[in-house]
Amino acid sequence: MSDDIVNVTCPTCGKAVEWSPTSPFRPFCSKRCQLIDLGEWAEEEKRIPSDVQITDSDEWSDETRY
């Protein structure tokens, strides 16, 4: 394995982050940036693109038991 230091860019703020065990929030530079990203996913500001269109009524029922 190589001892080269790999740097990545924080997806939230753009700051350089060392990709190593000493950077616990990688690829984010901090817990703050990690939580900002999580909030964007929770608010559906970010999403994985899909061609499939699902409506609320597709395969969902209040009567479904597991």
Curated annotation (Swiss-Prot):
Which superkingdom is the protein from?
Bacteria
Q: Where is this region: Disordered?
A: 46-66
Q: Where does Zn(2+) bind?
A: C10, C13, C29, C33
Could you tell me which SUPFAM superfamilies the record lists for this protein? Answer: Glucocorticoid receptor-like (DNA-binding domain)
Q: Name one Pfam family in it.
A: YacG
GO MF terms listed in the record are: DNA topoisomerase type II (double strand cut, ATP-hydrolyzing) inhibitor activity; zinc ion binding
Keywords attached to this Swiss-Prot or TrEMBL record, sorted alphabetically, are: Metal-binding, Zinc
Recite the UniProt cofactor note for this protein. Answer: Binds 1 zinc ion.
Query: Which HAMAP family does this UniProt record tie to the protein?
Result: DNA_gyrase_inhibitor_YacG (MF_00649)
Family membership, please give it. Answer: Belongs to the DNA gyrase inhibitor YacG family.
The protein's name: DNA gyrase inhibitor YacG
* Species per Swiss-Prot/TrEMBL record: Sodalis glossinidius (strain morsitans)
Task: Tell me the organism's taxonomic lineage.
Answer: Bacteria, Pseudomonadati, Pseudomonadota, Gammaproteobacteria, Enterobacterales
